[in-house]
Amino acid sequence: MKCPFCNNINTQVKDSRAIEDDILIRRRRICLVCNSRFTTIEKLLLRSFMVIKKNGETEPFNKQKLLSSILIATKKRPVSHEGINVMVNNIFYELEGKKENAVPTDVIGKMVMDNLFKLDKVAYVRFASVYMNFKNINDFSNIIAKIINEQIL
């Protein structure tokens, strides 16, 4: 790594630590020529993939869009932002690990619903009402009955 102060390439790593859910590595370095210290951050470059929307159009996967939809479902619920970020990262890494270059939105929606079901039942119903395009009160009754049956089993 080139020193930003003297442009020499003789540097040494003094300290390394993983940050942000182990997807970044922060390294403290020292230049062996001018003795300046500086910090670098390494990030794993993940492959990008596309999302196939219900109307057949494709668009690049947007992690922020996924986070926003989950934040809407969990608004004013006793769910930590840390828990939501972990969920978003887990979904992202699972999708990123798939062999396909394009993933349908229903696969992503199912993953979100599975995670929300474990995390918060009210957020699950909120998300389901949009994702499953609820038309009337019976749709809500059906999903709530499903939750009650799952808790009994």
From Swiss-Prot:
It holds the Pfam family ATP-cone. The keyword Transcription applies. A zinc finger (unnamed) spans 3-34. Residues 49-139 form the ATP-cone domain. Binds 1 zinc ion. One of its GO terms (biological process) is negative regulation of DNA-templated transcription. Its cofactor is Zn(2+). InterPro entries: ATP-cone_dom, NrdR-like_N, RNR_NrdR-like. Negatively regulates transcription of bacterial ribonucleotide reductase nrd genes and operons by binding to NrdR-boxes. Belongs to the NrdR family. This is Transcriptional repressor NrdR. It comes from Ehrlichia canis (strain Jake).
